[in-house]
Amino acid sequence: MNFRPYLILPFVAALVPALITLAMGSSPSLATALKMEVFVVRIVALTAALVAANAFDRGDYMQRAWLTYGLAPAFVTIRDLLFTFWLTRESGTPSEYVEALLIFLANAGQIAGVWMLSRAWQIAGIELPGSSQRRALLIGIGTLIGIAVTGPSMVLNLGDALHGEMRGLVALISGIGDIVSFALIVPVVLTALAMRGGLLFWPWGLLTASLAGWLLCDLTGLVRHIVENAAFTLTWRETFRTLACAFCLSAGIAQHAVNSRDIALP
């Protein structure tokens, strides 16, 4: 079974935001075009979770984990649809609270989903490489990396949130979700390493690549405080977002391809 295309195609997909930027240049429609691309890749991420979940029997732990992970793109997609066709982002309107609720639910789903995936090794009785102390240290390092990447933006968003700005609260919720998710990347990486040499390495390895893509996506939030070129940082942000979602789809397809129903977790 050849999984190399699943590794290569996400990098090809990640070229799309750059091609859009090159084609449109400094056009005022660039941001709109990239927003449309973002909507598509969020659908891709949701599809990935559904495809992966379908690889397991109903009620299986891994099915629940993937479906929970899929709540994040599902709620964000609902938010996008509502604010594209119905609601507007005006200060002091109920729509602000609707957006905050949907982002909270999306981040709760993301945290719960990554947490469930990160403890799959325990459910399956797999021995992870390294001692428990070393794993705890690596999780601590992952947490610090998450704080370093999202911290500066969160400080600004905290100030906005304290002044009653719902957008600041929404961004703050997203930042907290990202920090927790980054801390949980470590068990996912170690699970992939424990699976090396077998077919199950591929879905876990590709999932690791997806989570790394999200880390790079959030890193652009730090870069935009240094680089004043908004189009530059926006393009890179959407490039890494696309990479993360495409790798997630590859992971979902790979999970399904290895016929996981025969090796489903209890």
Regions flagged by a language model, labelled:
Residues 1-266:
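Polytopic alpha-helical membrane-helix bundles and their juxtamembrane interface segments
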